[in-house]
Regions:
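Conserved alpha/beta enzyme-core scaffold
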Residues: 1-205
Length: 205
C-alpha cells in the first residue's frame, strides 16, 4: 500500500544514489511509487516486510537473487518496531510458530503454548509521513497513515518526518499528538502532496 509513504523523502533518497540499503516496511511499494522507486534504481539489498506481492520488480529481483527478503507477520513486525523504540531487545510471540517463517528461531512454551523469540527492530534513519508537525516536532497522522509510522518513528536512531504543514506549538490538541517531538530529529514539508491511488475505480455514469 501507499498510505503514509513519505514520497518526497523516498525521492530524495533515490536521487542521493546511496546503495546497499536495508529497508523496513510493511510492503515493498508498487511499480513507480513508494519503495518501488528504490527497487527501480537497485538501491535496496534487503527488505524486511510483511507483504511484497504488489511489486513485479521486487519479484524479479528476488528470483534473480539480487535482493534478500525477511518476511514477518504484520503484527509481529509492528511489535518488533515498538520493542525497538521501547528499548526491549526481544520478546516471545506464538505467531508463526511451526511455519517456515520462524525456522531456526528459539522456541519456548508458556502456559502450554509454543512461542518463538523475535528481536527488536531499529533503523539508522526512520523516514516518516505525518499530516502535521508543530515547531517542537510533535506529529499527528491522518486515518490509516497512523499504521506503522508511529512505532517506526520511535525505533529510528534518527527520525525524519515529512509533513504537509508545520504549525505553531500548541496548535495540535495534546490528545492528537501521536508521536511526541522527543522522537523526531528533522521535519520536512513535502512538495506536491499528491495522493497516489493504486487502483483507481470510478463509477460508470
Amino acid at each position: 500500500g501507499l498510505c503514509g509513504v513519505p514520497q518526497n523523502l523516498v525521492l530524495a533518497l533515490r536521487d542521493s544514489g546511496v546503495k546497499g540499503l536495508t529497508c523496513v516496511s510493511n510492503n515493498a511499494g508498487v511499480d513507480g511509487a513508494g519503495l518501488g522507486l528504490l527497487l527501480e534504481s537497485r538501491q535496496i539489498d534487503k527488505m524486511i516486510a510483511s507483504y511484497v506481492g504488489e511489486n513485479k520488480l521486487f519479484e524479479k529481483q528476488y528470483l534473480d537473487g539480487t535482493i534478500e527478503v525477511e518476511l514477518n507477520p504484520q503484527g509481529t513486525m509492528a511489535e518488533r518496531m515498538r520493542a525497538g523504540g521501547a528499548g526491549i531487545p526481544a520478546f516471545f510471540t506464538p505467531t508463526g510458530y511451526g511455519t517456515p517463517l520462524t525456522a531456526g528461531k528459539e522456541a519456548r512454551q508458556f502456559d502450554g503454548r509454543w512461542h518463538v523469540l523475535e528481536t527488536a527492530l531499529h533503523a539508522d534513519i526512520s523516514l516518516i509521513k505525518a499530516w502535521k508537525a508543530d515547531e517542537d516536532g510533535n506529529l499527528t497522522y491522518r486515518m490509516t497513515a497512523r499504521n506503522f509510522n508511529p512505532p517506526m518513528a520511535e525505533a529510528g536512531r534518527v527520525t525524519v518526518a515529512e509533513v504537509e504543514e508545520i504549525v505553531p506549538v500548541g496548535a495540535i490538541d495534546p490528545h492528537m499528538v501521536h508521536t511526541p517531538g522527543i522522537y523526531v530529529d528533522r521535519i520536512v514539508v513535502g512538495e506536491n502532496q499528491e495522493k497516489v491511488i493504486e487502483r483507481r475505480k470510478t463509477r460508470e455514469g
